[in-house]
């Protein structure tokens, strides 16, 4: 397969971080703290060539990463209690307005870069991720589209769609000159159950019409779409090989002396975000 030019990938030197390899294992709040940290760390890395970060932060423990709008639900405590009853943890993420589900069948990937060295408009940044995922699906004979699936959870203009069904979504965060574009991909597992979980959460939390009315039928997994067995690790390796076609990936160092103090600070911010949710449940009158 002949691959097209991809300047965003080829014109960066990429550091590669995989939270699955971190010892000890990282909780969801720490993975989110690294998302916050990388866009602040990037200015320390820039040299003659633009520097970027590829961050895989898939979360095995069943977890819902809630968005800022979710935190304003009228009966948030009841919604969070519902998630707990279903065996799910939760955290408040720094990007994206609404919640997404994480489990062993979901792949999370972030691309972080510095706008000073590679300027991107908001739409253009989203389109880099769409292009990457689209190329990764070509060997499966799948064509990726990007448009909003309104009845999915966390609907957005750049929903990742195959055959009319959503397989993933993209969020974006900017801090000064730092940019992170993050995507989740439903690689395998029970996507209908994930959608039903989010529908139940919004119902329990008293969501009004400004929140999605989640319909499981509008979402699917990559494995179902391609009609063959596929797991998260296999698909992640395929993404790594694809990126490596354009530019070498260098293993990142979680203990980099410039990164550690940034992460230490951002970890406290991330923990505080999630603790604010936990306090909602603990403050319920019947708790």
What does each model-identified segment do?
Residues 140-142, 177-287:
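Long, positively charged amphipathic alpha-helical accessory segments at protein N-termini or as interdomain linkers
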Residues 164-172, 180:
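Aromatic/basic-lined ligand-recognition segments
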Residues 146-167:
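Beta-rich nucleic-acid/ligand-interaction surfaces
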Residues 1-120:
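N-terminal lobe of the biotin/lipoate ligase/transferase fold
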Residues 107-150:
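Contiguous, small/hydrophobic- and glycine-enriched helical/loop subdomains that border
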Residues 30, 34, 75, 121-132, ...:
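Short amphipathic alpha-helical segments
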Residues 17, 167-168, 218, 222:
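Local beta-strand/beta-hairpin segments that build beta-sheet-rich folds
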